[in-house]
Amino acid sequence: MNDIALASQKGRRTLYTYFKSKDDIYFAVVETELDQIKNRLDDVMQKDLRPDDKLVDFIYTHLDTIKDIVNRNGNLKADFFSNISVVEKVRRKLDLRERVMLKIILEKGIEEGLFSIEDPYFAALMINNAVKGMEVPYIRGELEYQMKNKRKQITNFLFFGLKQK
């Protein structure tokens, strides 16, 4: 609390008038950081791209942004790796928003004849969960090289899967 008061140039008592506990402050910081992801993904949604290109851009933007946020904020980085359930609790609103964005991309792809999906919301849920599953290895640098250098293979896998043509 002392560090937060010092950094914000406020007294500890002043902080407690706005926040009940350190956890409340932590959640406020995480929510502010997650707004950056939302803003960058909003930018992707505004781009004039084909739905398949927009989907790939969306995934890469999500991963790059979360990596930047976690690496920039030491406390968040420690909690992200040690207590993901706390981070999950705070990011529920973002997850729901991302799923809506993904659904919009998928529906546009269906409309344009690019995608054949029976349930766009369920597909959005699956994509959202798959991307979240890649976050930790991506942040640690275990996937970043492959994802940067194998974008075409990743795109082919995303759109064509495992089956032979």
Model-based region annotation:
Residues 100-112, 129-130, 136, 140-165:
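C-terminal peripheral helix-coil segments that are non-catalytic and often amphipathic
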Residues 1-24, 28:
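Helix-turn-helix
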Residues 28, 32, 39-68, 123-127:
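Hydrophobic alpha-helical connector segments
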Residues 63-103, 111-112:
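Short secondary-structure transition hinges
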